[in-house]
Amino acid sequence: KKLAIKKGVNIYKNLCEEILSYNGEITGVRLDNGNHILTDKIIFNGDFNDLDNYLINQRIRNKRVANYSRKNRSLSAITWMMKNKTAGFELCRHNIFFNSPYRKEFSDIFKKGRIPSDPTVYICAQDRLNNGSLVSGKEERLFLLINAPANGDFARISKTEMKTCQASVFSLLKKCGLEIDNPQKVPVSMTPQKFYQRFPGSGGALYGRPTHGWLSPFTRPSSRSKISGLYLSGGTVHPGPGLPMATI
């Protein structure tokens, strides 16, 4: 933030209620306080469903960016962030702990619409160097993620379900030989419901449409939309999240 302000950036803390246009071209945005900000270029960093459903005005609605239905959503997630001591073995910066059988996880999510009973766990150990050693200190920052159904707009996860889910996560890690000190005090940082609240229209989906099959990642909208001056970024547009597609 300090660097942005130093470079002359104006930061507005209001919500954007509408993207404005004239003759099919971007002219600005309308904020929730009624103010208009004039511009001929906008970078939208969010779920592209929000554009068609909420932000694009009627004048350019015929130039749809893209859309997807409730039945055609990608994965959501449950995540934890913590700063704890670990033991058992040295983590890498990126770590994946697979469940067994792996296919059951996606059956739980896409066919049954529920949190996997035995989820695969991803851990980003942010303070680890490439050789696995800690940058400094004994505690380290950890980001844990498991896949979940994108049903945040119509389903709620109970406290009992969350306790069961968290227990299965740390049970898998322990089974794999990783001990995390005092995991009971770890708060849940994000759920499908919270992702949905942050990105209305997504239902909590993180990647837009589902990417089933090797060609499906290429069906995402590109960064340049059909609307002159409107550009897209984020996990729902090409190349999507992570390194594999960005590398290609």
Residues covered by each model-derived region:
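Conserved redox-cofactor binding core of oxidoreductases
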Residues: 1
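A conserved beta-strand/loop element that lines the FAD pocket in flavoprotein oxidoreductases
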Residues: 4-17
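Short glycine/threonine-rich loop-to-helix capping motif typified by GTGT followed
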Residues: 23-26, 57, 155-159, 190-205
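Hydrophobic, well-ordered secondary-structure elements that form the walls
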Residues: 43, 82, 144, 173, ...
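A glycine-rich dinucleotide-binding beta-alpha-beta segment and adjacent secondary-structure elements
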Residues: 120-122, 179-238
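C-terminal segments that line or cap access tunnels to active or ligand-binding sites in enzymes
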Residues: 85-195
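Glycine- and acidic
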Residues: 77, 149-158, 231-237
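Mid-domain catalytic core of redox enzymes
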Residues: 15-135
